[in-house]
Regions:
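Conserved small/polar residues in nucleotide/adenosyl-binding loops
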Residues: 178-182
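Long, compositionally biased
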Residues: 63-66, 80-81, 121, 163-173
Length: 182
């Protein structure tokens, strides 16, 4: 699911996933392995993503990737293990930990919308790694909850909040905002 969502809109991701669940039922490594790359592509998945998804399913089936062992690992260990898979980078590993494994302390520096929400809440033009890590420490061990709030803010959940990154657009509006403290 997380590989499918890479670099596409949330709407497109949900559409593809819904189509897969409707046609295939429960999505398991066995189900994925039974499909050809071309069959996966018919759901709207790119050739590369189809190959990555098939490869991950095959590694689970062969025992090369033991899903159960991930449950006892630290977030850092899980991330390291997941990025060994083709097509899985840090952002995808973090999204898997957050949404599939329900890890409580995930705040992704690589997620543009999340960082945008953070800029909006704290009125920064830029959030560098050092500042991001300071905020993450503030939210630990429940940074995943902060992720959900920052995404909501970036998506417009709080009327009047603005992004402080300069776009150099003469049509940018200056609006009042409500300060949100998490």
């Amino acid at each position: 699911n997380s590989i499918i969502g890479q670099q596409i809109s949330t709407k497109a991701h949900k559409t593809i996933w819904k189509k897969m669940v409707t046609v295939l039922g429960e999505i398991t490594p066995q189900v994925i392995d039974s499909l050809s790359d071309e069959e996966l592509q018919q759901f709207g998945i790119t050739f590369k993503k189809a190959a990555y998804i098939k490869s991950a399913a095959q590694k689970v089936l062969s025992g090369e990737l033991d899903i159960e062992s991930l449950r006892t690992m630290s977030d850092e260990e899980v991330c390291t293990k997941l990025v060994e898979l083709d097509g899985i980078g840090i952002w995808t590993a973090e999204m898997l930990m957050l949404f599939s494994m329900l890890r409580r302390n995930i705040l992704s520096f690589g997620d543009l919308a999340l960082v945008r929400g953070m800029r909006m809440v704290y009125h920064h033009k830029v959030i560098n790694r050092q500042l991001f890590d300071r905020y993450k420490k503030r939210f630990s061990p429940y940074a995943s909850v902060a992720s959900l709030y920052f995404w909501a803010v970036a998506g417009g959940a709080i009327e009047g909040m603005k992004d402080y990154t300069s776009t150099n657009n003469k049509y940018d509006e200056t609006v009042s905002y409500t300060h949100l403290t998490l």
